[in-house]
Amino acid sequence: MRKSIRCGVAALALTVPLVFGIGAGTATAAPQESVLQVPVVTGPEFGPVGVPGGLIQTIPIKATVGEKPGEVRFAAADIRPYYYQFNYRHLTVNWRNLSTGAVGSAGLRHWIDEVDRTQPANQGGSQAYRLPLEVTAQTGAGPVFVTVTHDRENPDASNALIPGVGVLFVP
């Protein structure tokens, strides 16, 4: 009889914390990085206003989810070295949460700005250098549809032959 009472007390001592969640940690997933299913395809690039890399170029876009609930971090997967014509080019990320209908957009650079912007000759003009290399979008949780265009200044237009496209699940 004593042995069965001891076993019952031990079983009760082990199950009570589990039932009430005592000692159980909160399950969290590690952030997940992926590349959008379709990269941005730009072009044609030629002549004095083109950039190195060929007539038609691709810009893969990476997205990181799971760092914070309802947020996605976007950046170009391959950051390009500085070239003076990049001063007039940037990416625009547009997104729509398919569960809530929430929408948003943000601009970012896909190139390193190596120019000393403290010099008066290097200030003014193009504003693309002011954009960050990565942006965080407050999309909310759920499936999020993303498009990314490659835009240029002078004239203001998109030169994306095919916009980057992807669908993400944001926790």
PLM ranges: what are they?
Residues G43-V93, L98:
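Short, surface-exposed binding/anchoring microloops in extracellular/periplasmic proteins
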Residues R96-Q127:
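Extended, solvent-exposed segments with strong compositional bias
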